[in-house]
Structure formats: C-alpha cells, structure tokens
Design a protein with these regions (language model features):
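Conserved ATP-binding module of the ATP-grasp superfamily
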Residues: 130-132, 153-156, 165-202, 218, ...
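A conserved helix-loop-beta module that forms one wall/lid of the active-site cleft
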Residues: 99-166
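Glycine-rich phosphate-binding loop signature in dinucleotide/nucleotide-binding domains
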Residues: 73-80, 148-150, 185-186
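Peripheral (often C-terminal) accessory segments that flank ATP-dependent C-N-forming ligase machineries
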Residues: 143, 308-390
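ATP-dependent carboxylate/phosphate-activation module, predominantly the ATP-grasp catalytic core
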Residues: 174, 194-262, 266, 273, ...
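Short beta->alpha connector loops
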Residues: 10-15, 35-36, 89, 137-141, ...
C-alpha cells in the first residue's frame, strides 16, 4: 500500500472540492487554508483533515507572514509533502511557502510566469510567442518611447490581478499620463499593452512530466473584458478537436506551457484570435483550473474532470506511478451564466435534454449544454440568451 502523503491546499476562493475529495480517495491527508468569508461554504469537510481560515476578506491581501507562521506550526506535527494553489491569487503564496519550507514544486521565479502578467509577456516574447506590444511601467523614458512607436488605444493591466479585473482602457498618451498621476506610487504594479481586439479563446490543459496530455480549446462568445466592465451574459463553447483553429490553439498552448515551465498540473490559458485565425496572440496563462465553471463545461464535452485528474497527476508524481489519462469523449458543450432578479430562479420550465448542468447560486441563473454537434450548442445558447434576457 502507498504511504499517505500530506497536502496543504490553498484556496482564497471557494473552489477545488473535486480535487480535495480525490486526494482523500487516493489515501492522502488534506489540509485546507482559505479565507474566513468561505468558512460556511460547502467544502468537503469529511475529506479534509483540518481547515484553517485567514482573517482577511480579500484573498489577494492575505498576511503572508501569518500564513508562513501557521504553516510552520502545522509542519511541527505533519510533514507537508506538497503545497497546492487552487486559485490564481494563491499561486504566489504557494510558491513562497515551497521556498520557505523547501517543499518540492514550482518556486517563486517560475510561479511569476503564471501570476505576473508582465513576467508572462517577457517570457512569451523571449520564446518567440506572438503577443500584443507592451511595456513595463518602471521608467518614464521607456514609456514615452513605447507610446511614440505604438498605436493606441492601450490597456493598463494590474500585473497580479486575475482575468479582466481592474483593467483600464487608455485612449491616448495624454490619458495615460493622467492615469499615471492618479496611480501614483503603485504604477509599477501595472503594465501597458496594445489593445488588440479579436475573438478571445481559452485552452484548458493537463500536464504531466513536462508533457501536455490533455487539451481542449474553447471560445468566449463575449470578451471577458466586456462582460466584466459592461455587465451582460457570460458565454463560452468548446471547439471541435478537428477544427483547424482549435489545432492551432492547442499547438501554440503546448509551446507556451513548455516555455513557461509547467511540469505537472492543470492550466487555463487565453488567446486573442484575429483575422479569421491567421493571427493568434498570447494573452495570459495560469497554473490552475479555469474558473467560472469552465471546468464543468470542459468535462461535459470531454468526460475529463480537470480537478480530479489534477489530483491524480499529483498522486502519480509523488508515488512514482505512471499517470494514465482516461478515455476522452468527443462531444460539444456550451455554458451560459448571468445575474437574475430572483434569489432562486425557477428551473422547472427548462427541460431540454441537452441540459447537462444547472447553476445553483443566489441571484444567478446558468446552464451547461452537451450535444454531439456544435450547431445544436449554438442554437441552445442563442435561444436561452433570448429567454433569459426577457
């Protein structure tokens, strides 16, 4: 029988239940650290040895020294074998803990490629991966040169914020310098990037021993930036694995993950597709499963639970056993999620057999559809969008 290993899992947001459950099924001891606000969420407490909650409400602003001190206290009685970061904002915390306690896994330098948008762009540029023009915001002369050579508008992006959070659109050079004054001493925490409109696609993957074993490309029907800043309905749909654009995205994604140094685990990456797929630009990546229930959509299409398989990969790495990816389905799926006025929407009138999943969250309504054809998924997303808007 394999020995029991100890996992310390960090999740500033409520997520990763399937990962925690699978580790327990495999015989491991699981400790969880989350934010105090998540204490009453439906964590799989029966599978967790002990849960600890940080006092800060904002997971981006945990006291790292308190986290280190708490980990040191736990380490006195439990030899921690792995630290796993389940959310974007946990990647740097996990790396810091690994460095502090000399635990194997991704260190702080490599981790920056997966949470620091500036580091991502520098790494991509140096690897010859196509990206929008960008500049760090350290030196005024460098910025002036970039503004002179580059064509606006631009996006000022926080280096450490996930997705589209706190991104500011900058129309011209004067607007940039006005924003720079507003930002003050925190300007270095941002980067400036050319705004390159296009279709935003995402690629969800599993890596094992430096090899990408599973990948599924999907397309947002509304750019996340527009949804985050203008409200509206969140949509995405998977792409056929036989689609030419999907194949291009998969190949580019493999190059990105190899260049960035992801050895094992899950990743969620985003790309800008322009000119009908003739140009694909890298946007960002991460060393964790995708959010917004995109993992559920991928599972509906492929039969692969990214959270579960990530746990299986961690188990294989620790025990020295070879990991085998389960059989992959070739179906299509789509997701639609938005806010609604009722606290608990009435789902009884939605009876289409293609409904694979329903969202149960206060003041939200959402569905995942599953079918063998992309055409049917498109039809369902269009029809349900109209119904929800009414």
């Amino acid at each position: 029988m394999d020995r029991t290993y100890v996992f310390l899992c960090i999740a500033c947001e409520f997520k990763g239940g399937a990962f925690l459950r699978q580790l327990k099924r495999l015989g491991h001891t699981v400790f969880l650290v989350s934010s105090e606000k998540n204490k009453n969420e439906a964590w799989p407490y029966d599978d967790i040895e002990e849960a600890f909650f940080m006092p800060e409400k904002d997971g981006r602003k945990w006291d790292i020294n308190l986290l280190i001190a708490g980990t040191a206290h736990l380490f006195r009685t439990h030899k921690i074998d792995r630290v796993i970061a389940l959310d974007d904002y946990d990647v740097w915390k996990g790396a810091r803990l690994r460095e502090e306690f000399q635990i194997p896994g991704m260190g702080e330098t490599t981790a920056r490629h997966f949470f620091d948008k500036l580091s991502m762009r520098i790494e991509a540029r140096d690897a010859g991966i196509p990206i929008p023009g960008f500049t760090a915001l350290f030196n005024d002369d460098t910025i002036r040169e970039f503004l002179k050579k580059s064509k606006g508008p631009w996006l000022a992006k926080p280096r450490r914020d996930a997705g589209s959070l706190n991104i500011r659109k900058i129309a011209d050079a004067d607007a940039f310098w006005h924003w720079s004054e507003e930002t003050g001493d925190t300007r270095h925490q941002y980067l400036l990037e050319e705004f390159r409109p296009g279709i935003i696609c995402h690629v969800d993957s599993l890596n094992y021993n430096d090899e990408t074993l599973f990948t599924r490309a999907s397309q947002y029907l509304d750019a996340p930036f527009e949804v985050a800043h203008g409200g509206g309905i969140f949509h995405s749909k998977t792409m056929s694995t036989k689609d030419a654009l999907s194949k291009k995205l998969v190949n580019l994604n493999m190059k990105v993950l190899a260049a960035f140094g992801l050895r094992h685990g899950a990743s969620h990456s985003e790309y800008i597709v322009r000119d009908g797929g003739k140009e694909i630009l890298f946007l960002e990546t991460s060393a964790r499963c995708g959010g917004a229930h995109l993992t559920d959509m991928v599972e509906a299409a492929s039969g692969i639970s990214l959270w579960t398989e990530w746990a299986n990969i961690e188990h294989a790495v620790l025990t020295g056993k070879k990991y085998h990816l389960p059989m992959v389905d070739e179906l299509q799926a789509g997701i639609i999620v938005t806010l609604c006025k009722p606290e608990k929407p009435d789902y009884e009138t939605f009876t289409d057999p293609e409904i694979w999943w329903k969202l149960h969250k206060k003041y939200h309504i959402g569905f995942i559809f599953q079918h063998k054809t992309e055409k049917k998924i498109d039809e369902l997303l269009s029809r349900y969008t109209k119904v929800i808007q009414e």
